[in-house]
Curated annotation (Swiss-Prot):
Organism (species): Prochlorococcus marinus (strain NATL1A)
Subunit details: In cyanobacteria the RNAP catalytic core is composed of 2 alpha, 1 beta, 1 beta', 1 gamma and 1 omega subunit. When a sigma factor is associated with the core the holoenzyme is formed, which can initiate transcription.
Taxonomic placement: Bacteria, Bacillati, Cyanobacteriota, Cyanophyceae, Synechococcales
A GO biological-process term: DNA-templated transcription
NCBIfam families: PRK02625.1, rpoC1_cyan
Binding site for Mg(2+): 471, 473, 475
Cofactor: Mg(2+); Zn(2+)
Keywords: DNA-directed RNA polymerase, Magnesium, Metal-binding, Nucleotidyltransferase, Transcription, Transferase, Zinc
Pfam families membership: RNA_pol_Rpb1_1 (PF04997), RNA_pol_Rpb1_2 (PF00623), RNA_pol_Rpb1_3 (PF04983)
Name this protein carries in UniProt: DNA-directed RNA polymerase subunit gamma
Length: 635
């Protein structure tokens, strides 16, 4: 983080996500008050007092830990108003500050026994299992108190390090160790639960294991080699991030700020609360009960059962339903855990951070715009007037059409011709960005020149559809207006659709006709079997130029699939080039007429072409005329 800027906001170079140590977790939530008291640990499961409706001290909404629930007011009411800013009340210990600190101040729960982090234990792949080089099933047996694991073999010759033992097997070994005739001096050490897992992870020397793995990889092959590489990769990542494997076992749990898991009073006096509060409450209750059982030296079986329950409560808090039975609330609805809040389409990242609403943007259904140029898109007038409103207001005032913003807005609401004229001037040369989710590659966002259209749908050129993976069956697209002149320049130079013809991934053309265009081209050039071919000289079906055919089509004197004779002087390709004409006739003036299947040529005495009529369909005339025009425009 750079410290060069002395303003209130901090400028970050990057955000790094890595494992947090137990000390770091406690550091997040711990604060030392001016009187020397350290606060931050949440020890009580209570939320608010049902009589006073104020947060309970040391509870999940504690004002001493998280800050006051009312601006500039302590819990007991001794200090009120902003003039007491920064004072810590000597009676209740609450700092007099703004209530918004409750959105970022954290707390923590110090656990009476370590618990495994369910993401690293039950994730795919399981990092704990990979690091320990043990099957996931065996690691689970240890964590959930089904099996003991050997941590130190001592003098025993029958045991192996990391060997799993059932309750009965361990009892037998214990009997041998403590028998009168036993020769074992160094007793083997076994463990169970997350404490044993933590011990196994602490025993790992990552650098030595990595060195050994590199030697083994050099001499192994196949499935075994792939497994070793997988383990080495995980170990190298731990070394690179300076994280210790035992941090995957939690000694303290962070408690997120109370305003991010609120409790709201409803009209009937009842309360609606975030599911996280219920999950935190389960953890605190079980943690306190475990601490009490350890204090009174309760039997091992009871303590172990409570530790397992604590492990399950923490699992449910972090990722409810990942392992074991899903914790449900009222009306059998699964409670939303921290993972549920973060992950998925409706999660914090995709919904609230990446997908947040922005100014100067809109969204609408897309329809095909066949008359558009490739770099253009049809923008509905209603949408354009809203997106470009500040620009329109500025221009209306500058042109002295109105005197102030209020008058300009009234004029815009009427949407008369004057406003539309100004809007047309504003959007001229101002590119807009179109984006279709999901944006899987850079061509998912492209720039276009807007053209005002009637209706409420955005019109899109059919050739750019493959880049967006869009079709016209109800897809929606978002519109964004680049504001800065640099952004507009970048959009025009780099992002314009006509500049993005090749795929950045493969280099192949991405602007290819597909779907409607292929079908349309086929329909346009298709021949109807039952259509009658006219004889040459039939006045009603003979035309002097391609333009005459198009004019006749526009006047609805002919249809797309009608056969016509049309005079054409350009190059043609024909299937019967190598064959002889069907009929050849020399006229009195020395010119020769040649009749072929689909054309009729008139040649002079030297064999040079005087005129040519071709037999074709109206649709093919439309197709060829369009292509000839396009080629002429680019050359």
């Amino acid at each position: 983080m750079t410290n060069s800027n002395l303003r209130t906001e901090n400028h970050f170079d990057y955000v790094k996500i890595k494992l947090a140590s137990p000390e770091r977790v406690m550091e997040w939530g711990q604060r030392t008050l001016p009187n020397g008291q350290v606060v931050g640990e949440v020890t009580k499961p209570e939320t608010i007092n049902y009589r006073t409706l104020k947060p309970e001290m040391d509870g999940l909404f504690c004002e001493k830990i998280f800050g006051p629930s009312k601006d500039w007011e302590c819990h007991c009411g001794k200090y009120k108003r902003v003039r007491h800013r920064g004072i810590v009340c000597e009676r209740c210990g609450v700092e007099v500050t703004e209530s918004r600190v409750r959105r970022h101040r954290m707390g923590f729960i110090k656990l009476a026994a370590p618990v495994s982090h369910v993401w690293y234990l039950k994730g795919i792949p399981s990092y704990v299992a990979i690091l320990l080089d043990m099957p996931l099933r065996d690691v689970e047996q240890i964590v959930y108190f089904n099996c003991y694991v050997v941590l130190d073999i001592g003098d025993s010759k029958d045991l192996k390090y990391k060997q799993l033992l059932t309750e009965d097997e361990w009892l037998e070994i214990e009997d041998e160790i403590y028998a009168e005739d036993s020769t074992i001096e160094n007793e083997p050490i076994v463990g169970i639960g997350a404490e044993a897992l933590k011990q196994l992870l602490e025993d790992l020397n990552l650098k030595e294991v990595a060195e050994q793995l590199r030697e083994d990889i050099a001499t192994s092959k196949g499935q075994k080699r792939a497994k070793l590489i997988k383990r080495l990769r995980v170990i190298d990542n731990f070394i690179a991030t300076s994280a210790s494997p035992e941090w995957m076992v939690l000694d303290a749990i962070p408690v997120i700020p109370p305003d991010l898991r609120p409790m709201v009073q409803l009209d009937g006096g009842r309360f609606a609360t975030s599911d996280l509060n219920d999950l935190y409450r389960r953890v605190i209750n079980r943690n306190n009960r475990l601490a009490r059982l350890q204090e009174i030296l309760a039997p091992e079986i009871i303590v172990r059962n409570e530790k397992r329950m604590l492990q399950e409560a923490v699992d449910a808090l972090i990722d409810n339903g990942r392992r074991g039975r899903t914790v449900v609330g009222a009306n059998n609805r699964p409670l939303k855990s921290l993972s549920d809040i973060i992950e998925g389409k409706q999660g914090r990242f995709r919904q609230n951070l990446l997908g947040k609403r922005v100014d100067y943007s809109g969204r609408s259904v897309i329809v095909v715009g066949p008359k558009l140029k490739m770099h253009q898109c049809g923008l509905p007038k209603e949408m354009a007037i809203e997106l470009f409103q500040p620009f329109v207001i500025h221009r209306l005032i500058r042109q002295n059409i109105v005197n102030n913003i209020k008058a300009a807005k009234k004029l815009i609401q009427k949407a008369d011709d004057e406003v539309m004229q100004v809007l047309q001037e504003v959007i001229e040369g101002h590119p807009i960005l179109l984006n279709r989710a999901p944006t899987l590659h850079r061509l998912g966002i492209q720039a276009f020149e807007p053209k005002l259209v009637a209706g409420r749908a955005i019109q899109l050129h059919p050739l750019v559809c493959p880049a967006f993976n869009a079709d016209f069956d109800g897809d929606q697209m978002a519109v964004h207006v680049p504001l800065a002149i640099e952004a507009q320049t970048e959009a025009r130079m780099l992002m314009l659709a006509s500049n993005n013809i090749l795929s950045p991934a493969t280099g192949d053309p991405i602007v290819t006709p597909s779907q409607d265009m292929v079908l349309g081209s086929y329909y346009l050039t298709a021949i109807q079997p039952q259509a009658k071919q006219p004889k040459f000289g039939d006045y009603s079906d003979t035309y002097a130029s391609l333009e005459d055919v198009l004019q006749a089509l526009e006047d609805k004197r002919i249809d797309l699939h009608d056969w016509v004779w049309v005079r054409f002087s350009g190059e043609i390709e024909d299937d019967d080039e190598l064959q002889k004409p069907l009929k050849s006739e020399t006229l009195k003036d020395g010119t020769r007429i040649e009749e072929w299947t689909y054309r009729r040529d008139r040649l002079d005495e030297d064999g040079s072409l005087i005129s040519r009529y071709i037999l074709t369909t109206v649709g093919r005339v439309v197709m060829n005329h369009t292509i000839i025009d396009a080629v002429a425009a680019t050359s």
